[in-house]
């Protein structure tokens, strides 16, 4: 889908210029409501959102007259590696950061090279960096960038969605149909609601108010459920914050994948196979309370966000010393050229391998045809011999 450039909208245009302007990281075109749950978690700490900043184009963001925009940077980064580092006008609070290779590059060095030089310096100015998972922390530490394990900002979601429900219900979010049916058969006389975080529809930034209402509706559903079974981090972690008993399912029995590292320990966990075999340590009739381990992370996250907002409003956050625009462009151009060279090298190697395989196939086909002809000749001779 071709992206049409759009002016960054203001959520709450102010009649007077405030002492500080605040930005909110969002994904402009969205098909996973989990991204909006992350944005909602950051929004609760801001006096207002003066700017919505497109996560995938954070480098090209421009504020009015270049004014500083104080922004909590909790998000999944490097899905669009060409768009790092953030624009100079963004004054960041780096926490709940997740860096991942995504699908843009196939080689490890092509991914992490954007954390060298200016890309890494953008983080070093604000050390230590709050990392959502241990794998992200290890990646940054390998680049000599100091970190701390912050967990996800959704751990701070407020428990404000409690309401009376006519009949008890449970939720199964983004799980296999077999899991949903097993839960229905084993949870007693409780309605089981199926939830999809990715429903196939794409919502644009012009639907922001509608997207926020959808997040609040989803969180209301989760907070009032008897329990939740899910494969989604951005279901499981909000349920921790909301106090709803939750079981996180993942195919990796070690729970050591990039996204789960350090976070799975906060949750009740099982594989789908363990659940279906009745081996999960999670009673659907009397669901266990969530582990309290996340509370220390929640407290520090709240402290960091409030201190950041207070300092921004007080004007005590100094302007950083930044490279010139020319230096940034030259650095990014060099990184892009290097990445392109690597990709072209990979393409050339793939083409050579394809040529080799094609030649092997042609030789195999030729050998097969020769064998078939020989078999035909032998069969014909056998037939002649029988007639004699």
Label for each model-derived stretch:
Residues 3-372, 376-383, 387:
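Active-site anion-handling motifs in enzyme catalytic cores
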């Amino acid at each position: 889908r071709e992206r049409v450039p759009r002016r960054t909208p203001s959520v709450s245009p102010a009649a007077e210029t405030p002492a500080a302007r605040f930005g909110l990281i969002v994904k402009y075109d969205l098909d996973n409501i989990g991204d909006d749950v992350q944005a909602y978690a950051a929004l609760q700490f801001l006096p207002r959102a003066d700017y919505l900043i497109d996560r995938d184009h954070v480098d090209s963001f421009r504020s009015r007259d270049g004014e500083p925009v104080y922004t909590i940077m909790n998000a999944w980064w490097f899905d669009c590696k060409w768009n790092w580092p953030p624009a100079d006008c963004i004054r960041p609070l780096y926490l709940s950061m997740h860096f991942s290779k995504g699908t843009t590059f196939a080689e490890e060095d092509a991914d992490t090279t954007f954390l060298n030089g200016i890309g890494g310096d953008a983080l070093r100015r604000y050390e230590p960096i709050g990392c959502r998972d241990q794998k992200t922390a290890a990646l940054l530490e390998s680049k000599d960038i100091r970190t701390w394990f912050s967990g996800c900002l959704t751990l701070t979601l407020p428990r404000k969605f409690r309401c009376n429900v006519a009949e008890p219900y449970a939720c199964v979010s983004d799980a296999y149909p077999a899991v949903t049916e097993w839960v229905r058969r084993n949870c007693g006389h409780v309605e089981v609601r199926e939830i999809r975080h990715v429903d196939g529809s794409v919502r644009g930034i012009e639907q922001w108010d509608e997207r926020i209402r959808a997040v609040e509706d989803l969180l209301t559903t989760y907070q009032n459920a008897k329990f939740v079974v899910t494969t989604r981090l951005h279901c499981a972690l909000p349920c921790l914050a909301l106090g709803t008993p939750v079981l996180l399912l993942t195919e990796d029995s070690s729970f050591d994948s990039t996204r789960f590292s350090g976070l799975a320990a906060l949750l009740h966990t099982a594989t789908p196979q363990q659940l279906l075999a009745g081996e999960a340590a999670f009673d659907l009739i009397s669901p266990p309370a969530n582990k309290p381990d996340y509370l220390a992370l929640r407290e520090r996250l709240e402290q960091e966000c409030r201190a950041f907002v207070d300092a921004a409003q007080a004007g005590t956050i100094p302007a950083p010393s930044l490279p010139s625009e020319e230096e940034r462009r030259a650095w990014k151009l060099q990184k892009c050229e290097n990445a392109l060279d690597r990709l072209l090298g990979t393409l050339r190697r793939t083409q050579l391998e394809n040529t080799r395989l094609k030649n092997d196939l042609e030789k195999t086909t030729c050998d097969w045809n020769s064998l078939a002809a020989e078999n035909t000749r032998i069969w014909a001779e056998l037939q002649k011999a029988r007639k004699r």
